[in-house]
């Protein structure tokens, strides 16, 4: 029988810079520990009264908006555990590092964290660095929970039918999102003709696009056009004009919010006045598109604003701003998942960091039920969370929950 971990009330916590010490790139100082944990446990580390947890993400660079949110959420939860007395009296020591959105830096960070004695990792954030760490982590059998990396290959190699036994995720996968949005477009919205525009060569974009196309066609729909662009492109008018000529009822645009804003504006300029759909990369779109451009648009996400007012109020009180996107609650849930596993290993009386300890963490997570900010979830045979998705529409230009689907 699977065990349940209850959602913890969100408590006041130190800001990320205060709570995680000096957050540096991996080439810098490796002394990136949580101030809260370090203060509580100064002089106690040698006695085994602390448990080291890595928290890794891009805190600088193009995708830092995601990394900062994940690290904020994770740090808040880990500090909360410490404020409640830790795990069986032991404090959590946070080893937090900035991988700058780079896969090579991510591996360097992970290796340094292992050298410092972490027992589990919350990270990474985006797909490509997470894939690199997942491959490296197997040699350490390091328990690893990514908050937000969506590529199927993070936890499962389809070519060899092999599960990455030590790796889990709190978010849903690229295939899941593509399939869900195809189902929603065809079954709930009634569209039968769709076009797709996405960045070629990008794991996230291609993963969503491929699964949307396959599912939409399997339901009886028609994909009238598929258009691609390259990384760094800023002019999409040629592709959008081609789509316009194919007369779709809806366009699936599985890209990140900065590009989505540009695509929506250019679609309006060429006269492509049909609804657009997207995945969780749209989270953060507010301010990048107008109400007219977002009319009848939908996207899927792990979390919808208003789902947990206590969480949102506490985040705003602590950081002086509203939570930036759905990556913050995912970071919180990823940390909760890691702590669930650590609790089981500690209850078994194992020595933190040894092979049996890490395996106990992995086994507990695989069989656990997490009651998180993004909903209650278990893990399937590929270590993906089993949960509903939030479908968001727009009130003007503000995303709001339409329904759970």
Regions found by a protein language model. Give the residues of each.
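Extracytosolic ligand-binding ectodomains
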Residues: 2-11, 27-405
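Bacterial N-terminal signal peptides
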Residues: 15-21
């Amino acid at each position: 029988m699977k065990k349940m971990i209850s959602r913890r009330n969100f408590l006041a916590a130190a800001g990320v810079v205060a709570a995680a010490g000096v957050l540096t790139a991996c080439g810098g100082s490796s002394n990136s520990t949580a101030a809260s944990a370090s203060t509580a446990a100064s002089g106690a580390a040698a006695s085994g009264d602390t448990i080291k947890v890595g928290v890794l993400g891009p805190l600088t660079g193009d995708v830092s908006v995601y990394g900062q949110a994940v690290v904020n959420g994770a740090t808040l939860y880990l500090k909360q555990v410490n404020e409640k007395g830790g795990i069986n009296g032991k404090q959590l020591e946070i080893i937090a590092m900035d991988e700058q959105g780079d896969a090579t830096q991510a591996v360097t960070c992970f290796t340094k964290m292992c050298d410092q004695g972490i027992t589990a990792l919350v990270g990474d954030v985006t797909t490509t660095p997470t894939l690199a760490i997942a491959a490296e982590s197997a040699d350490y059998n390091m328990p690893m929970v990514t908050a937000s990396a969506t590529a199927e290959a993070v936890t499962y190699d389809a070519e060899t039918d092999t599960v990455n036994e030590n790796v889990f995720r709190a978010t849903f996968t690229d295939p899941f999102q593509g399939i869900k949005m195809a189902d929603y477009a065809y079954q709930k919205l009634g569209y039968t003709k769709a076009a797709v525009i996405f960045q070629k060569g990008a794991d996230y974009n291609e993963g969503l696009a491929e699964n949307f196309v396959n599912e939409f066609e399997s339901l009886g729909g028609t994909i009238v056009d598929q258009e691609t662009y390259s990384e760094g492109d800023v002019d999409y008018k040629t592709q959008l004009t081609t789509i316009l000529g194919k007369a779709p009822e809806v366009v699936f645009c599985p890209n990140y919010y900065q590009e989505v804003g540009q695509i929506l504006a250019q679609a309006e300029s060429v006269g492509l006045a049909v609804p657009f759909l997207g995945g969780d990369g749209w989270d953060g779109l507010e301010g990048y598109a107008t109400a007219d451009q977002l009319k009848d648009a939908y996207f899927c996400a792990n979390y919808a604003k208003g789902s947990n007012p206590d969480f949102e109020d506490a985040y705003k009180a602590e950081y002086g701003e509203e939570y930036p996107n759905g990556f913050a609650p995912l970071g919180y849930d990823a940390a909760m998942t890691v702590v669930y596993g650590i609790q089981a290993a500690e209850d078994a009386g194992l020595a933190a960091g040894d092979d049996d300890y890490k395996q106990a963490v992995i086994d507990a997570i695989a069989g656990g039920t997490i009651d998180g900010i993004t909903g209650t979830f278990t893990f399937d045979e590929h270590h993906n969370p089993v949960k509903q998705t939030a479908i968001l529409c727009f009130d003007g230009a503000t995303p709001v929950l339409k329904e759970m689907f």
